[in-house]
């Protein structure tokens, strides 16, 4: 958390409706007086997440009256151009596989850079200083735009380019998926964990039918595997305590 988070401060959360962004939304609601959310429609195969995010926002407000009082406007931006220039498994109906460069073909070049740039432009207009994202480089697929160095460099560029002092908050940067589940429990109790399991969406293929202990998804894509492995470690630690 940044040092100047407190009464009167506001935050804009990049909120996709997935596990990580739901946890970061809870984190922001626990810290800031006013919290708005931002989602993106960029032609993703798992576009069902846009439907899930509406349900998750409502469920989080119902879960905690204090959160409901802080939760402000929700924004959605269409970024069709990002999907048009990206030849990836997230925006094309192709099999998920590793590329010669060592990255999975689910990597959408520049996605987080574009997301955070638009988020900063919106935060500028809305008078919000803190921009919160679920980027992480501890337990991730190797995406370069999730790295701490990238986020820090982008914060400098955005502040120079907009003559503001935005703070890019990444509360998940140095924790793994098991710790992300534990953070959700600390923030909202088992009720928030259950909400994340049942209502959030992570699967790259957009599968909502199969129901696993960790939630809905195909169970085989990289996103599902990370979520499942993290949940298994989280549950094992709970049993041993």
From Swiss-Prot:
GO BP term, example: queuosine biosynthetic process
TM region positions: none
Top EC class, one word: ligase
Gene3D superfamilies: HUPs
Pathway(s) of this molecule: Purine metabolism; 7-cyano-7-deazaguanine biosynthesis
Reactions it catalyzes: 7-carboxy-7-deazaguanine + NH4(+) + ATP = 7-cyano-7-deazaguanine + ADP + phosphate + H2O + H(+)
Keyword Kinase: no
Co-factor note (free text): Binds 1 zinc ion per subunit.
EC number: 6.3.4.20
Domain of life according to the entry: Bacteria
Keyword entries, A-Z: ATP-binding, Ligase, Metal-binding, Nucleotide-binding, Queuosine biosynthesis, Zinc
Entry annotated with the keyword Zinc: yes
Residues involved in Zn(2+) binding: 203, 218, 221, 224
Binding locations of ATP: 15-25
InterPro entries: QueC (IPR018317), Rossmann-like_a/b/a_fold (IPR014729)
Xref: Pfam families: QueC
Cofactor(s) recorded in Swiss-Prot or TrEMBL: Zn(2+)
Classification via CDD domains: QueC-like
Function: Catalyzes the ATP-dependent conversion of 7-carboxy-7-deazaguanine (CDG) to 7-cyano-7-deazaguanine (preQ(0)).
UniProt record similarity statement: Belongs to the QueC family.
Name used for this protein in its record: 7-cyano-7-deazaguanine synthase
